[in-house]
Every structure is written in C-alpha cells, then in structure tokens.
Amino acid sequence: MHVIGLMSGTSVDGIDAALVEISGRELDLQVDLIAAQTYPYPDALRNQILAVCRGEPLSIEALAGLDDAIAMQFAQAAQSIQAEATLTAELIGSHGQTVFHRPPQGNLGYTLQIGRGAVIAHQTGINTVSNFRVADMAAGGQGAPLVSKLDICLLSHPEFYRCVQNIGGIGNVTYLPPLTDASQLGMGVKGWDTGPGNVLMDLAVAHFSKGELTYDADGAWAAQGNPCQPLIEEWLRHPFFQAPPPKSTGRELFSPDYLQTCLQTAASYQLSPADMLATLTDFTAATIVYNYDQFLPHPPDQVVLCGGGSRNGYLRQCLQQRLGGSTVLTTDDVGLNSDAKEAIAFAVLAYWQQLQIPGNVPAVTGASGPILLGELHLV
C-alpha cells in the first residue's frame, strides 16, 4: 500500500512528508521510502503556532482559523509529495501540529493537535487517519512517544542493545533489547521523552541573534564556546529529569520562560553567547545520557539518532563524549532516513489502523493496554 505520512513536531519548522510503500504486519513489516520532503511553514503561520505554544491567549475563532490554515498546509504537502513521486497514495497518516500537551498526573492527560484530518481527506481525495495520540491518553497513557513500535519493528538488532534517540524540538528515546524472534516482540522495550531536544538551543540562537537566526547549523556557533559544567549539573536537578518513565513533555515546560531562567542562573558566570550555546548543547546531551544512566536496565551498545538534532555535529560530539563506549550512529547508517523517520512512523500508524493493529506500546506510554490509534476520515 502506498501511504503518505505527514508530521510537524515541536520545532515547528515545517511539515515533513514521506510517501512510502508498506507491506507486512509487524516484525515482517516492509517500508520502502519513495519520496520525502520538508515543506517550511510560512513565517507568519509559524509565528502564530509558536505564540499558541507559548500560551498566549487566543480566541476560539482565531484557533479555528489556525486549524484551517494548518489543515490546508498539510493537504498541500500531501499533494506536493505525490506530484514529486508521480504516483497516487491510497492513505494518509497525518500527525497534525501539537499546540498543547498535558501529561497525565493522577488523572487523564490531554493533547491537542490541530490541522484536522477531515479537511486533508476532502482536499486530497485520499482517506486520512489523524488524531493519533488521544486514544492512548484516554487509556491512561502519555500519548507519547508513539514511534516506539516502528522502532521495534524496523530498528531492533539481534545482538545489540540499541537506544533510538529522536532529537526534534523535544527528545525521546526507544530502548530496544536484542530481538531474535517474534515471540520477543515488545519484551523489555522502554521509551519516554528525555527532555529538551533542539528547543532550548533554538530559542537561545533566536535570542542571541535578535531573531535573525532560528537554529545553530551543525552546532557551529556552540562549537566556538566552552560549556559550563556547574550550570549543567544545576539544571539537571529539575524534577522532570528525576522523574521515572513513563513521562512526556513539550514546549509547555521547555519554553521561553525556561530559557530565561537558564540565562538568569548563568548570569554570575559571565558567559559569552558562544559559551551559553555550548552549555545548552552539552546540557541537551547530558539530559539524554542522564536518562539512560538512571532508567535503563542495560547500557546501550549503539545510540541511533534521528530528527533535526542528528545533524548537529557539536551535539553529536557532546553525546559521544558523555556516552563513552556506546557507538553513536544515525538511522541513515542503519537504512532509515533520519529526516523522514517521524513522517514514516505516522504513515505506518495509519497503515496499522487500517489493519486493526494497535500502534502503541503500553510499556512505553503507560496506557492500560494495546490501543488502535487514529481516527479515520473517509472521502
């Protein structure tokens, strides 16, 4: 089946689209990437989304208009990737754009992704599955990470302990023990949000460049500085990093206000912008490795990176130094496009929804059981 996956994450830099051919079910799953592209948001739309994520007040009417605009952008991305591939998809899996995420804390969690699937289905003429996270949260889960089952099926290794580490705006990990046969599917797998991915680095770059830059390409600016280890140790004491999984987070926590707190605690150290970026980049690496050290039953032989942060050379260097003997790779090195991986995941989740195969991993999300994810919008 030809399926389009659409995803925009917490970095809010655009819509990742992947057109894939999928066959099989779970461990025999076959996914062939035909085309992948990122379609940047118009600046005005991106700024609107970021304002909502910051918690700025918005009327219901304005939120409806933003939902409309994002749905149309997602539909256009689906049409564009089809045109590039010169073939027609049979199904779309659209994650939408997260603007709010409240993990469960003794009650049900709540999550809101806008860019509704009914509009995408109507505009493209293709059946569309959307709103993937809400069913897991209704069953008491975190609604995240949802890529873990794909990681199990496509990235498990028969000998190595692997951590598949996504570094988008927020970081998340899937821990994969060696897998040798289908009877072990899901056994020992863990996953959770590790904390900030690119979000604090991106916010700091925008702050220090006075809005001229949105990210630190390859970590080049950070590489000119020196990280302040006492600050990193202080920041790691935040309750989120101490909390055991399952856990999830978002821009609600790692926000501009959080960055301002970091800048205030750093004031006495008189750091240059490059030093501050180096510190935030190494802090991001430290949060990842701290999570592994605290909550994994076995250290990883390989850490397989994906997401935009996998292209940050300085961040990879910081990770490798902190990981010691673990090998740091990207999913490209093991046959899965790192930029398109999350979009591919939502194509597969839509495909599983059609086959009535649950898409969550309860041991990862904390849901009460396996759940069929997504809502189907028929043409």
Curated annotation (Swiss-Prot):
Gene that encodes the chain: anmK
Pathway(s) it belongs to: Amino-sugar metabolism; 1,6-anhydro-N-acetylmuramate degradation; Cell wall biogenesis; peptidoglycan recycling
Role summary: Catalyzes the specific phosphorylation of 1,6-anhydro-N-acetylmuramic acid (anhMurNAc) with the simultaneous cleavage of the 1,6-anhydro ring, generating MurNAc-6-P. Is required for the utilization of anhMurNAc either imported from the medium or derived from its own cell wall murein, and thus plays a role in cell wall recycling.
The keyword Transmembrane appears for this protein: no
UniProt xrefs under SUPFAM superfamilies: Actin-like ATPase domain (SSF53067)
Protein family per UniProt: Belongs to the anhydro-N-acetylmuramic acid kinase family.
Keyword terms, alphabetized: ATP-binding, Carbohydrate metabolism, Kinase, Nucleotide-binding, Transferase
Catalytic activity, reaction form: 1,6-anhydro-N-acetyl-beta-muramate + ATP + H2O = N-acetyl-D-muramate 6-phosphate + ADP + H(+)
InterPro entries cross-referenced by the UniProt entry: Anhydro_N_Ac-Mur_kinase (IPR005338), ATPase_NBD (IPR043129)
A biological process term (GO) from this entry: peptidoglycan turnover
Entry EC no(s): 2.7.1.170
GO molecular function: ATP binding; kinase activity; phosphotransferase activity, alcohol group as acceptor
Primary enzyme class: transferase
Superkingdom to which the source organism belongs: Bacteria
UniProt keyword ATP-binding, yes or no: yes
Biological source species: Acaryochloris marina (strain MBIC 11017)
Designated name of the protein: Anhydro-N-acetylmuramic acid kinase
